[in-house]
Every structure is written in structure tokens, then in C-alpha cells.
């Protein structure tokens, strides 16, 4: 097969591993910067171009689109989809998962347990919002934040009010969530491919922090997950419509709680911690699903 990887930086670990895994299985691979793709959108001659040339048909496209370029990156991916390429994560699923508020609403509708979450626009509702999530300590999150950026633990009610007011002063969209104290700065990252959790790690926050993101200096170890955690991770990914997802779960006294569903999970931390060939599993999923029937169905 001919596979395109959409990424701004082909030297990143995940891109290199996906390229390596695909080539090892006999596929042709090209890494394309989505911001250098441009499109002709017309009924008779839709096409996609790259650095002065019209791109050929790709059997499959692997999106590695960062949150900063979600709008244009998913537009480029959507054009590949329209031309019959199989996407490992559809554009609509990526945009759904990137919207933190929408994704939490969808997960809640499916009965998937979450930390109690509140959102309000008016400053008049701040007090009720804090009460809604159980009072302080609580977590304030930027809706647009990633990798632990824009996440603040407010230890007291006064601190919570100050943080919320400060974010509002910047015209930022925020969520307020209950603080799961018993998680002790730990969470479980489940890597889902299709209908299977192929690997899971426990992430631990560095000393003095409560954010367990590896990008923030957190540590990782292999996690043994329960059947319930496995079921919830798969259901969360499927609710977003994602073939590949990193599902972050907090272990609370009342049971596992989904914190976030990541549409473009990094492979380095999970592969190096567990030894699982996740890139290979992703390519195998493409091989099973990027069929001629798919191309006919989508008009390719």
C-alpha cells in the first residue's frame, strides 16, 4: 500500500516508528506537512497538492496532527478522505475529541463515568460552579489546553475564584472539575487500537505537581488494568469514533473515571515503557481496513 503520514515534523519518535513499521511490512510511505498541503475543491476535479505537485492517490493516511493546527490539519485530512484514502482516525473524530467540552458531553451521554465537571459563562455563577463540583480543592482547565498546559489545582475556594476570574479576564474558555485526591497525581493511559487496549501505563506526576503528563516530567511504568478499565477505555474511544486513541483514566474510590480521550497519542512513552510494538499494531489495523471496498464507498 501507499501510505501518507501527516505530520509537521517527520523526525518525531511517533512518525519515525510509524514509517519504520509500515516499511518493514512492505508499504511505501511519504511524510507530508499538512500545512504545506493545498487543495482544489470542485465537483469534477478535486485534488490535493504539495509543494508544487499534485499528490497521487494514497491508500491510507495516518494523521499526526497537533492541536495547534487542528482546523487546517483536519481540513487536509478530510480532502484525502474525499479522494478515497482510508484515514487512521477520521477528521470528524479528531475534531470531536479535540473539543474538550463536547467530548465530555458525549462521554456522559454514553454513561461513561467522569470527574464531576462544570462550565459557566457568567461571573455571577462562579460560586454555584464551585459548589457544583464539590468545592475546593478543584481543578481549573483551559478548554484549549494540551499536555497539562493550562491546568491549575486550586487548593482553596478563594484560590479557585481567583484562578477562574483570571482566566475569564483573558477571555479563555475553562472547565472546572472535582479534584480526585485519591488518585495522588497518578493516572492510567490506555492505548486503544480498534476494539482492543494494546498497552497501558501508569503515569505519575513529578514531585510537587499533580499533573501526570510525561511532557510535564511525569514518570511511567507498566500498568495492569481491570476488565472494567479496559471496557471503559474501548467504549470511550468508540464514542469519539476513533480507531486509535490514548484514553486517560483516573482511579477513584467510586471506580475508574475517564479524564480525556487523546486523538493523536504519542507512542514513545508507551512503547518504551511496555515494549509493545504499537506502531506495528496501527499498521496492521490499516491493512485490515484500507480495502478497495472502502475506496469505492468513499468515492476514491
UniProtKB/Swiss-Prot annotation:
Residues reported in the UniProt entry to bind Mg(2+) 2: 260, 262
Cofactor note: Binds 2 magnesium or manganese ions per subunit.
Signal peptide, first to last residue: none
Domain of life per record: Bacteria
GO cellular component, one term: cytoplasm
EC number: 6.3.2.-
Chain sites annotated for binding Mn(2+) 2: 260, 262
Coiled-coil regions, chain positions: none
InterPro entries, per database record: ATP-grasp, ATP-grasp_RimK-type, ATP_grasp_subdomain_1, RimK, Rimk_N, Rp_bS6_RimK/Lys_biosynth_LsyX
GO biological process: protein modification process; SOS response; translation
Binding site residues for Mn(2+) 1: 248, 260
GO molecular function list: ATP binding; metal ion binding; ribosomal S6-glutamic acid ligase activity
Residues annotated for ATP binding in this entry: 141, 178-179, 187, 211-213
Keywords: ATP-binding, Ligase, Magnesium, Manganese, Metal-binding, Nucleotide-binding, Protein biosynthesis
Family of this protein: Belongs to the RimK family.
Protein name stated in the entry: Probable alpha-L-glutamate ligase
Amino acid at each position: 500500500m501507499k501510505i501518507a503520514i501527516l505530520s509537521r515534523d517527520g523526525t518525531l519518535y511517533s512518525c519515525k516508528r510509524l514509517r519504520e513499521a509500515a516499511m518493514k511490512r512492505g508499504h511505501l510511505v511519504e511524510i507530508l506537512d499538512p500545512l504545506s498541503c493545498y487543495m482544489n475543491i470542485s465537483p469534477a476535479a478535486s485534488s490535493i497538492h504539495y509543494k508544487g505537485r499534485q499528490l497521487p492517490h494514497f491508500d491510507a493516511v495516518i494523521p499526526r496532527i497537533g492541536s495547534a493546527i487542528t482546523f487546517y490539519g483536519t481540513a487536509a485530512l478530510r480532502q484525502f478522505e474525499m479522494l478515497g484514502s482510508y484515514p487512521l482516525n477520521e477528521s470528524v473524530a479528531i475534531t470531536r475529541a479535540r473539543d474538550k467540552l463536547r467530548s465530555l458531553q458525549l462521554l456522559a451521554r454514553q454513561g461513561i463515568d467522569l470527574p464531576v465537571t462544570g462550565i459557566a459563562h457568567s461571573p455571577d455563577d462562579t460560586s454555584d460552579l464551585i459548589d457544583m463540583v464539590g468545592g475546593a480543592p478543584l481543578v481549573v482547565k483551559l478548554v484549549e489546553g494540551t499536555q497539562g498546559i493550562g491546568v491549575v489545582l486550586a487548593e482553596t475556594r478563594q484560590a479557585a475564584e481567583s484562578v477562574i476570574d483570571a482566566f475569564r479576564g483573558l477571555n479563555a474558555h475553562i472547565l472546572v472539575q472535582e479534584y480526585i485526591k485519591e488518585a495522588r497525581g497518578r493516572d492510567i493511559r490506555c492505548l486503544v487500537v480498534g476494539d482492543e487496549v494494546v498497552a497501558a501505563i501508569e503515569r505519575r506526576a513529578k514531585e510537587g505537581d499533580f499533573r501526570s503528563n510525561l511532557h510535564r516530567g511525569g514518570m511511567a511504568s507498566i500498568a495492569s488494568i481491570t476488565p472494567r478499565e479496559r471496557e471503559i477505555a474501548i467504549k470511550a474511544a468508540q464514542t469519539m469514533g476513533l480507531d486509535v486513541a490514548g484514553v486517560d483514566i483516573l482511579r477513584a474510590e467510586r471506580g475508574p473515571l475517564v479524564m480525556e480521550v487523546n486523538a493523536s497519542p504519542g507512542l514513545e512513552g508507551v512503547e518504551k515503557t511496555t515494549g509493545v510494538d504499537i506502531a506495528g499494531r496501527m499498521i496492521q489495523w490499516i491493512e485490515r481496513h484500507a480495502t478497495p471496498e472502502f475506496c469505492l464507498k468513499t468515492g476514491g
